Structures are given as structure tokens and as C-alpha cells.
Amino acid sequence: MGLPIVAIIGRPNVGKSTLVNRLAGEQTAIVHDEPGVTRDRTYLPAYWSDREFQVVDTGGLVFNDDTEFLPLIRQQALAALHEASAAIFVVNGQTGPNSADEEIAEWLRQQPVPVFLAVNKCESPDQGSIQASEFWELGLGEPYPISAIHGNGTGELLDELIKHLPPTTELEENNEIKIAIIGRPNVGKSSLLNAFAGEERVIVSPISGTTRDAIDTFIERNGQNYRLIDTAGIRKKKSIDYGTEFFSINRAFKAIRRADVVLLVIDALDGVTEQDQKLAGRILDEGKACVVVVNKWDAVEKDSYTIYDYEKNLEARLHFTEWADTIYVSAVTGQRVEKILELVTKANEEHKRRVSTSVINEVLEDAVSWHSPPTSRGGRQGRIYYGTQVSTQPPTIALFVNEAKRFNDNYRRYIERQFRQQLGFKGTPIRLLWRSKKVRDVESGSANRATRV
């Protein structure tokens, strides 16, 4: 990436995510009063005193407990530290140092990066200095009293931090494609991301809902850069309490909006559920390119009709995203995983594609000759004067007609099908804007406007 990385390390519930949000200037890491909310490592851009860098939020470190996700969180923290240029060790100034802090400090002293000790929750500057002084005993140098919530003391910490960061590599113009990986809990989104990245970048567990943040991972294939956004699994609203999971789902929807292409991951064993349909509808509403990824295909018992039957079911259940490519993969074995990126690249190209006005009107002329527009009860027939593409991402075509309400849904779908059959647009939704226009306005338009259909 070219930017120095700063790892944020500490035991659970000391305010690491709050500090990350303070440094990055946005609430991206989930902050909640439930201990251990951050499980994976999350990369965010930060800026201080003309220096750009990335901060990496990690899960809460606990060395003397191997239950649940704790060994995996340690692995994530170690991976973050391995790629970091510096680390900020966050401790709780209100409770003072404890044995967990001492264990982490001992581990950090063995690491080859400079470590800065941030004593958080020092809300009073006078009292904060006293609270911070207790942490000299950790042997990591000067403790910096800070308040991640209010920002007190973070300037002094960052002033010292940036002195130890290596020079920023000049970044080339980035041609990355942003991909959001979405789906219900436990369909294999994180396994898929790890298969792309070639490392255990995200905690993978059979327990539903292991991933809580939207996390960015950067990969490159054949000169093309991809930014992969893994997201918390999306459940039905009635099964969500308004705590951490509520914020995760909200962030997953934001990840869809950030993305160029969305991977809708479906569990091959469960088939298409009502929630999958709602997610597909969300992708369509946001106008995003999409690839449908049917995961766990290796676990499906197959005969000569399996793929045919599955495709018919997908076509029936996801008919409103029939324009999206579908691929059957196994994130665990790696089967066809790399092929996904080829489909993503093609979908992204179609999403950004622009078609000339003359070509659009040739398609319209043929479509109208094959199937005339509807006629009103009074005998007045609908007329399409001309069409022109007005934007991309998604491709959006304005159709100027004599009376928009005269064109019913069936005819509108027919025109969209004609555009797809003649022009492609595989992998992306297209939007048609039906605009009423009086014929005299059309005839008085500029001479180089599209020919009337």
C-alpha cells in the first residue's frame, strides 16, 4: 500500500477502537460497552502533521485463556504487528496496570518495532499525569495520558509517533476495484476472503456471526488491485438486538454503498433464503454490480442434474438479479475461487461502460419495430422519441417519450431486455428513466441530438 502501518494493541475493553476512531476521524471500528467487541484487524487511514499512515485495530489480547476466539485474536494481533512500523499499546488509566498488561508488555518488548504506551481514560489532565505515572513499571518508556473519547493528549502521542515512522512511499494512481463480500451469517464470507488473501486474515469459526466489522484487505492479481471488504453476516431484523450486531449490519450496508462490485455469498446447502432475496434487492437498490457466489459447493451431493436444478432454483428465487453472473465455489478447498476475480473485473467494466447515443437509438428502433408501445384506452399510442445514456455506475439511460405513464411495467421490462440482449451489461443493473416530453420540444432540440425513433 505504501503507507506506514501502526498497530493498536491492548487487552479487551481498554478503548482501542475508540482511539482508532479518534485517529481516523470516523466511527468505523465498532465501539460498544461489551468487552471484546473487535475480533479481526481493521485497517483505516489516519493523518497527523502532514504524515499519512494506516492504523490497524486488533482484538483484545488475553494470553492466559484459550477459550472461544482468544487464540485466533492473538494470531491476528501478531500478524498486525508483523507488518507494522510502530505499535500503540493502550491501557486503562482508571484501573491501573494489571497482570494482563504486564504479559502484553513483556511480549511487546520482544518485538522489533517501537512501542508507544497510551494510558487511556485519563479524562482530567491533572489526574491523568498521576494515573499515567503508574505505568512506568511496564518498562516501555514514557506513558502518554490520553482520552480517546475527548481527544486529550492524543496530539502529544502522535507528535512522538510520527518521528518513528518510515518515509511514505509515493502511491501510484490506484486502479483498485472495491468488492464488498456480503451474506447471511456463517455462509463462508471470511473463508472466502482468506482464500483470496492467502492468509488467515479474518477469524473463521463455525460459530455464527464471528465477523463483526467491515474490514479491508488489499490483493493484486495480474496488475489489477482489489480492495476486499468482509462484512458481518446479515440476519433478519427480528433476530437482532440493538447492540453490537445492529451496528455491524448497518456497517455492512454501508460497505455495499462503498463497493464497486458486491459478492452475494449463498450457502449451497441452504439454497436461496428469504434473507438472500432481501440482500439481492438491497444490491439492486444501491445500483451495484454483483456476482452471486454459491459457496460450500464441495459439500453438495451431486448427480448429472444437480447443477441444472440449482440454476433453475436460483433463476426463480433471484429473478430480479438475473443479470448477475453466478459461480459455484468452495472457499475451503479453493475450488474456482480465483475465477471470481475474473467475473468481478468484467462486472466492474460493464458497470462503468458508456454506450453512444446512436447505438442506444438503434436498439430502440429495433425494439419498437418488433413490439409497438402500448396504446391508451382513448387510442393514443405511446411513442419513444429518443434515448441517451446519462450516467454510469450503474449505466443509466434516459428515454424521452410522449407520456411516461402510458408505458406499463411489462413494456418497460421488454425495453430493458432488449438493451441487455443487444448491448450486454452482464453483471450490472441498468436503470431506465422514462421522461415525458412534448413533441415540439423534441423537434426544437439541437440538430446533433439523437434521431427520433
UniProtKB/Swiss-Prot annotation:
Domain KH-like: start-end pairs: 353-438
Entry keyword set: GTP-binding, Nucleotide-binding, Repeat, Ribosome biogenesis
Binding site for GTP 1: 10-17, 57-61, 120-123
Gene Ontology molecular functions: GTP binding; ribosome binding
GO biological process, one term: ribosome biogenesis
Glycosyltransferase keyword on record: no
Residues holding GTP 2: 183-190, 230-234, 295-298
Alphabetical list of CDD domains matching this protein: EngA1, EngA2
SUPFAM superfamilies xref list: P-loop containing nucleoside triphosphate hydrolases
Family label: Belongs to the TRAFAC class TrmE-Era-EngA-EngB-Septin-like GTPase superfamily. EngA (Der) GTPase family.
PANTHER family given in the database record: GTPASE DER
Name recorded for this polypeptide: GTPase Der
Taxonomic source organism: Trichormus variabilis (strain ATCC 29413 / PCC 7937) (Anabaena variabilis)
Gene for this chain: der
